[in-house]
Amino acid sequence: MKWIGWCLLWLCFAGRVGAEGPTVKVGSKKFTESVVVGELLVHLASSSGAEVTHHKEMGGTRILWNALLSGDIDIYPEYTGTITQEILAGKGIAGLPQIRQALAEQGIGMSLPLGFNNTYAIGIKEELAVRLDIAKISDLVRHPELRFGFGNEFMERGDGWPGLRDRYGLPQREVRGLDHDLAYRGLQSGDIDAMDLYSTDAEIKHYNLR
């Protein structure tokens, strides 16, 4: 899976200055890590004297990106991999200078990487992994009967399901797009056998996933 680091995206000339000082609208996606980074932004901006509003768990990438472009929010945390694979998809952009230039052309600024990262992984329940002797992605080739439930963004990304399927020659045909939270519930209930994970998800330990 592709390495994915965090950075911050903001609308250039964002923030409003009122009688009591600047105001900043922070956005975050619908999962814990994004909300936590959003809260860090809130505390940082507040400590600088700004009046800050945090719009938590707004949704997925497109919702946050469109909100940023329209000025509904001023800043939000984003994955560098998501920027290249979704927001700037098809442009052949990879390096940070190229990413920054392409975003600047749309009036969007980007911070330096925040110094930590997250990656996609495939998760299955530990007992199923033991029974089927699955320890790595290539082992899935031997089990075409497995049912996959992936986040909708993962289903569409070039480095998501399409790239994973082609790279490993995965034969599974029962593959559906789900909300990330619903996929965890589906895995627990037995409706699906495998899902995409963020490697920092607390649910990995909670649900005893491999």
Regions found by a protein language model. Give the residues of each.
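Bacterial N-terminal signal peptides
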Residues: 5-14
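Short, well-ordered beta-strand elements
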Residues: 20-33, 50-56, 144-149
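Ligand-binding cleft/hinge of the Venus flytrap
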Residues: 41-49, 137-176
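Short helix-initiation/N-cap motifs at beta->coil->alpha
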Residues: 54-66, 173-185
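N-terminal segment of the mature folded domain
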Residues: 63-116
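Hydrophobic residues within well-ordered alpha-helices
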Residues: 68, 140, 186-188
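A ligand-binding cleft/hinge motif common to bilobed small-molecule-binding domains
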Residues: 79-99, 185-210
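A conserved helix-loop-strand patch within extracytoplasmic ligand-binding domains
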Residues: 96-148
